[in-house]
A protein has these predicted regions:
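Hydrophobic ligand-binding cavity/cleft-lining segments
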Residues: 1-52, 56-60, 161
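A generic structural micro-feature
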Residues: 6-8, 47, 62-66, 93-97, ...
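Intrinsic-disorder/low-complexity, polar/charged segments enriched in Ser/Thr/Lys/Arg/Asp/Glu/Gln
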Residues: 9-15, 52-54, 67-69, 82, ...
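Hydrophobic/aromatic beta-strand elements that line small-molecule binding cavities or substrate pockets
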Residues: 14, 43, 69-76, 99-107
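Hydrophobic pocket/interface hotspot
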Residues: 25, 29, 35, 74, ...
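Glycine-rich portal/gate segments that line the openings of hydrophobic small-molecule binding cavities
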Residues: 46-89, 144
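Beta-strand/loop substructures that line and gate deep hydrophobic ligand-binding cavities in soluble
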Residues: 89-137
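A conserved amphipathic terminal alpha-helix motif
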Residues: 126-161
Length: 161
């Protein structure tokens, strides 16, 4: 095998209706306790600076289980109608992942339509797993995040335990 580094890029888009006002949704998407509850595999999440988070996440992607240490930058410049988080994580021998999202929050009566486009790039062993596995895993993780987020926003998950 050659010494070249393999990389894989993907893009996901979706729209979710959340039973809360736009301001509450924006606030929740920036709440460290809510994010920690919703991010699949999140073990640690802390605020480094006002708009910068440090995370440790363990994920299994196909046969590869990796613990990522990473950083997320939150860009609240268009708050509360939109924001653009971006980040990168290093999974050691498993490789790396980096990406970002453009998130739009649209008011609709007492609900909010959350529309996003996320782009990600993986490298190392992760990229060698193939496009189909990486894309299906990314979709699954995204679905898990938003299912948990909806449960938190609807009060089904109580973070004040």
């Amino acid at each position: 095998m050659s010494g070249t580094t393999r990389e894989y890029k993907l893009e996901l888009q979706d729209e979710i209706i959340i039973p809360a006002t736009r301001e509450k949704v924006f606030e929740a998407l920036n709440d460290i306790n809510i994010l920690k509850e919703c991010i699949p595999g999140c073990e640690e999440l802390s605020r480094e600076k006002e708009n910068e988070l440090i995370a440790k996440v363990t994920l299994k992607i196909g046969p590869v289980k990796a613990r990522f240490g990473g950083r997320v930058i939150l860009d609240p410049s268009k708050a509360p109608s939109a924001f653009s988080p971006s980040g990168e994580g290093d999974g050691g021998i498993a490789g790396f992942a980096k990406g970002g999202a453009d998130v739009e929050l649209i008011e609709s009566d007492a609900e909010t339509i959350l529309r996003y486009t996320a782009k990600a790039e993986t490298g190392g062993k992760l990229a060698q797993l193939g496009a189909r596995l990486i894309t299906s895993t990314a979709k699954k993780l995204s679905k898990m995040f938003f299912e948990r987020f909806l449960r938190v926003m609807s009060g089904e998950i109580d973070l004040k335990k």
